[in-house]
């Protein structure tokens, strides 16, 4: 556990009391909520690194994209990164990430970095760094967990992106801070990474609803088609992402391999009803945040506990991790 991480509570006491106005639009209370740092995104003593960043989310996305090398897709070992550095994937807090990034290369975050000068991580890490940058500028921004269609044709791949409030257009945009400007999918499609449409990124709630309705095949949802681990595909992965997305909407941006009772339970009829209600509240890019926060606060099974079980994507044993004290 990082002792320097700021205190917070899983009951989310900082959630605003304001709600959605009569037109269904996000009010200033919730915009302010998402414009402030969470326990995970707080830069702490490294806050100075976020000074002087670009003032718009498009440029911020480019900065965040240049800080992470993906632990699988980026082939870090082939770039000469020592195997012991693979444990950087467990960097839970932005303060920890920024500290390590300055060790790898001193100077502003906007500078170009070689693969060896980037932090080994995944989409979640690009996202929380992007969140920290946006929130430092007062931009309302939050993480969303779901499935991308632009990595492996025909499959929905486990992924985390950001959702940014566009003040000019008065709407939320799904933005992927983990792919480069020149990224093209394997089937030759260029991705609208600054405004992902539903056919490119399916929110976990929508994935759950479509699979429950029979309009999508749950066997197409997974971490990686080449990964033959039962819990990383089909219903277990969809359920896991659904619970992770609820936590993210409550500004509790966990590692993607963190699990707790709400994400790994054996499903009963009661559980299915609960998850159906959860999917109903989180399946859109403009959910009723008052209901989302209330759902999280009222159901202990869905809340992230102080101690979680963190699985090891590198193949090691699971570990109990206390992230909240």
Predicted feature residues:
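Substrate/cofactor-recognition hotspot
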Residues: 295-325
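A near-ubiquitous, low-amplitude feature marking generic local secondary-structure context
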Residues: 43-47, 81, 110-113, 117
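Active-site neighborhood of thiol-dependent amide/isopeptide-bond enzymes
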Residues: 87-160
